[in-house]
Amino acid sequence: MENFKHLPEPFRIRVIEPVKRTTRAYRDEAILKAGMNLFLLDSEDIFIDLLTDSGTGAVTQDMQAAMLRGDEAYSGSRSYYALANAVKEIFGYEYTIPTHQGRGAEQIYIPVLIKKREQEKGLDRNKMVVFSNYFFDTTQGHSQLNGATVRNVYIKEAFDTDVDHDFKGNFDLEKLEQGILEVGANNVPYIVCTITCNSAGGQPVSLANMKAMYQIARKYDIPVIMDSARFAENAYFIQQREAEYKDWTIEQITYESYKYADALAMSAKKDAMVPIGGLLCFKDNSMEDVYNECRTLCVVQEGFPTYGGLEGGAMERLAVGLRDGMRQDWLAYRISQIEYLVQGLEKIGVVCQQPGGHAAFVDAGKLLPHIPAEQFPAQALACELYKVAGIRSVEIGSLLLGRDPKTGQQLPCPAELLRLTIPRATYTQTHMDFIIEAFKQVKENAKNIKGLDFTYEPKVLRHFTARLKEI
C-alpha cells in the first residue's frame, strides 16, 4: 500500500455510539450555561469531541479480551505482575507502581523527590526550581502546590508556527544548564522530559537531545522523570526524522529512550489506549529508596501498590495496550490523520503549528489578532467553533498557563494555540473534512469574535472549572 495518497484506517469498526445533532440556537445557549468553558459542557451536547485524547478513544479487541483475565486480589495480584513484566519488557524498568491516572503518579513522586533533595542536598524550598522542556498542566500544578517554581526551557523554534523543525519538543540545553547553575543544583529536585511535548503542539524530543539532557542531569546529580503519556508517538517521530534510527523498530527506540531517565510517570490513557490508568516506574535500585517511599504514599493516596486504584482487569488491559499502542501501521495511520487535518486547515488559510502527534494546533493568535492574550483568543475561538459546528476543542495558551503563584500576574504565554485533539480510532477522514469545513465558517466571521474575561477564576488549574463571559 506504499503508493496510495491516503491510507484508510487500519481497523474495522465493530461497535458504534450514536451522537446527537443540535441546532445553532441550542449550542449558543449551552455554551453560555457552561460559562464559555467547554470543560463544563455535557458530552451529549457535543457532535465531535476533540477536547482530549486521554481515555476517549477506542480499545483493541485484545485489550477488551484481556479484561477477562483480571485477578482482583487486593495484594499480590497476578494482573499486577503481567503489567510489571510489560513495563520491564518495553521500558527496561525494574520497579512499577500502578496509579489511577498520570496525576496520581505526580502527587506521589513530586513530594518524595523534593523531600529527598532537602535531606541529602540541603535544598532550600524558598529557592526551589524544577525544569522541563514544557510541563504538562497537572505536572506544573503539583510542582507549584509543593512550593516549586517551574521553568520551561524549550528551543526558540518551539512555538514559532512559521518555522518547521524536526524536534520542536527539544530542551534548550544551554538554558537548562544555565538555569541549574543560576539557582544552584541542590535546589533542583528533578527535571521532567515531556514526550511528546503537548504544550508545544505534540512536538517530539530527539534521542540526541534526551542523551544530552541526561548528561547534564547526571553532571549535577539531578533525577530525570520521563513524562510518558505519548511515548510511542515520540518513538515514531524519532524513527521518521532522526536518521540514525530510521531502521530501528518502535520497540527498540522506546527501550533506548528510557535509558536517559531515572523514572517514568505516565498517563496511560493516551498512547497505551486505556480509558483509565497510570504508571510510576523506576529504572533500577539507584532509585530504590524513592520507590519504597512512593509505595508508602501509594497506599494512602491510590491503593495498595499492586493495584494502585485499578481493578485487575484494567491492569491486564493496560499491559496489552502498552504493546498495541506501539504498532508501526497504527502509528503511521494516526500521524497521517493529523497531517491531513493540518494540511486541510492551512489550505483555507488557518495557520497551524507544524504537525506533531495526537492533535492539530491552530494558531489562534494569528486567526484572531484583535483579541489580546489577556482576553484568551484561543478560548474565544474554541467557543466559536462549538457554536458553529458542535465541535469541542481545548485552549492551550494563556488561560491554561495561568498566573504566577507568587505575584498573581498572568504568566506570559509563548503562543495562543487551539488544540484539536484526535481520539484514537474514533473519527474518520469524513470527520476531518467536516472540521475543516467548520473552520471555513469560523474564519469568515473571525473579526466579530469577542475576547473573554472571568466571572469565576480558581487559583489552581483554572482552565478546568473557570467561568467566563464575552467582553
From Swiss-Prot:
InterPro entries: ArAA_b-elim_lyase/Thr_aldolase, Beta-eliminating_lyase, PyrdxlP-dep_Trfase, PyrdxlP-dep_Trfase_major, PyrdxlP-dep_Trfase_small, TNase, Tryptophanase_CS. Its EC number is 4.1.99.1. It catalyses: L-tryptophan + H2O = indole + pyruvate + NH4(+). One of its GO terms (molecular function) is tryptophanase activity. PROSITE patterns: BETA_ELIM_LYASE. Keywords: Lyase, Pyridoxal phosphate, Tryptophan catabolism. The modification N6-(pyridoxal phosphate)lysine is found at K270. Its cofactor is pyridoxal 5'-phosphate. Pathway: Amino-acid degradation; L-tryptophan degradation via pyruvate pathway; indole and pyruvate from L-tryptophan: step 1/1. HAMAP family: Tryptophanase. Belongs to the beta-eliminating lyase family. Homotetramer. This is Tryptophanase. It comes from Histophilus somni (strain 2336). The gene is tnaA.
